[in-house]
Each structure stands twice: as structure tokens, then as C-alpha cells.
Amino acid sequence: MIDLGVVAGEASGDLLGAHFIAALKKNHPHLRTAGIAGPRMVEAGVEAIYPSDRLAVNGYVEVLRHLPELLWIRSRITRHFLRERPRAFVGIDAPDFNFTLEAKLKQAGIPTVHFVSPSIWAWRPERIHRIRQAVSHMLVVFPFEEKIYQDAGIPVTYVGHPLADVIPLEPDTDAARTALALASGPVVALLPGSRLSEVARHARLMLDAAVRIHQRHPDAQFVLPAASEAAAGLVGQAMRGLDLPLRILPGQSHTALAACDVALVASGTATLEAALFKKPMVITYRVPALTAYLMRKKALLPWIGLPNILARDFVVPERVQEAATAENLANDALAWLDDATRRAAAIETFRTLHLSLRQNASARIAEALEPYLEHA
């Protein structure tokens, strides 16, 4: 029998899950956890029935292409948990996958906790009704989300964001540059995304922007953290024909962000990481045209990047779809590099944001799960 079932959908969920699993094991050293997990959660002691990267698809078109496999995995993992009957289940992000699973487990009497609310405040707010059916307790990472669930009558706890606890309030840029053996001069980080589909869409775009930046700043250096060997391979293919001082770093996104002056970042958790590292950035994103059309019809907010959403303002530029051109990204990055006053204002905004999210999230999550695990 397992004590806790878990499902994390991609690299960011794997990182979030690893932190709170480690916190839980301080009080429950023999805690048995199993489910869909990535390498960091496995390292924390989770038995991976399936690897997280099997779920790492995004957008309507991509999901449709992978739908048979996703449905098969969800059916198998649902049967597994119904048979094993864990004391509780925690779904980490991946709402479209997890809510159906959670609804079936909750209906069978297994408490379901969901960690990281979907962005119902940005689009598809009607999902709150599905969440009410599926989730016994919602754990939210942003302070404004708590009231949304309170108003809907869904038990909720604001736990803060684990990344705000892990990332130092004052990152050591000099140490990171020394660790990467970078010379003096501007450093630009390129973060095209953790999913292979994102890397395929954004890598060449960012590299072309980097070429333009390098033309203006010949002493500039570029770092690109790759989430996997496959991602590094895609970047290598995108680099063909380009002459650029680029370092591809395997899985070192935090070191890259600590070292850089400015970042080009695909929308997602990495934008929050960049803000927590107090780095001015340019946010970009491309999806297939049909996906973009459907998402725009349902959008509620003018921003897509987490730093802007949290600040309720365009603190950093966003370049999406048609506006996501190498020229635009390069010009926006150069504007950051050339304006120290603007950089300082953004850094101060990021510092305020960091303090609001720094809540010792792993301990708060462990505390919220404690009633389900008292005798584990």
C-alpha cells in the first residue's frame, strides 16, 4: 500500500513536488509515495510508475496528437490508485490531466489535494465548477488566488511559491559567472522552454535575436540551459550556420539566470524564476495558429507572463505570436542593457514580488497534508 499518490506533469511540477516530498519525509521518513514523477521527485523517494515527461505536451493541437497515449496513461494510473487506495492524492499542476483523475478518486472516497491552481483568473474561469467536483483541498502559490477559491466554497490554503524559498533574495551574479568561466561583458540567458515542442518553436528565434544583440555588443556572451539531452540536441540543430559565443548548459537554469544581465524567456515558470533572480527579461511565446486563436478568444488578462500578472502591469515586454520576431526580441533586450535606471526599477519590483511569495511553501504544504498522513 502507498501512503500518498502523486502526479506531476512536467519539469516544473517535478521540481515543485520534490521540495514538498522532502519536507514531508522529515516527519514521515518511511512515507511511501508513487505515481507520475520526474527525476527530482524520484530522487526524493517517489516511485515513478510513469515518467513526468510523458505528460509534457501543451496546446490544443499538441494534446490532440498525443491524446490516445495520455488517455491510456490516465486510465492505467487511475486504476492503480483505486486499487492501492492511498491515504491522499496530490496532483501537481497538469490540470487537464489531473482533474479527471482527481474527480474519480474523490468519488471513491480518496481525499484529493491539488497543488498549483490553473490560471482560471487568466482564462477559462468556468473551470472552477470542475475543480469543485474534483478537489478536496486546493493549495495555491499566489496570494490573490486564495479569495477566488474561498468565494467558490472550495477549501484552500495559500502556501507561497517554493521557488521563492529556494532562490536567494540576493543572487550572487559574480559567483555564477565564475562557475561558468564567463569573461567580463554582458551576459544574456536564453530560455526557450522545458518542453521539446517549446524548444523547437523558440530556440532558433532566440538564437537569431542573440546574433543581433551580439552585433551591437561584440563582447556579449550567451548561455542557454537545456532541460534535457533531447532539448540540447534541438538547440544544436538550431545553431547550425550561426557564429555565436553560446554555452549550452545541461539543466543549469538557475546558474544561467544568476549569471545573466538580461534574459529572453519563453512564457511559463521560467519567467517567475527570472524575476526571482531579479533579472530584466523579454517574455515570448509561440504556439500553433489554431491554439493561439482559441486561447485569445478565452483570455481574460492583457498579460501572459507571471511577473506582469503578479505586478498587474507590463513591467517587462511580452512578444507573442506575430510579434515574436528576432528583431523585436533583440531590440527589447538591448533596451534593457542600455538603460540602467529602468533595470533598477524592474529589479526593485521583483524584490517586492519575491518577498510576497517567500512563505516556506514546502513546510506549509506538509502541514496541509498532515491530517491525511497522521499514522503514516
PLM feature spans:
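Nucleotide-activated sugar donor-binding and catalytic core shared by glycosyltransferases
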Residues: M1-A376
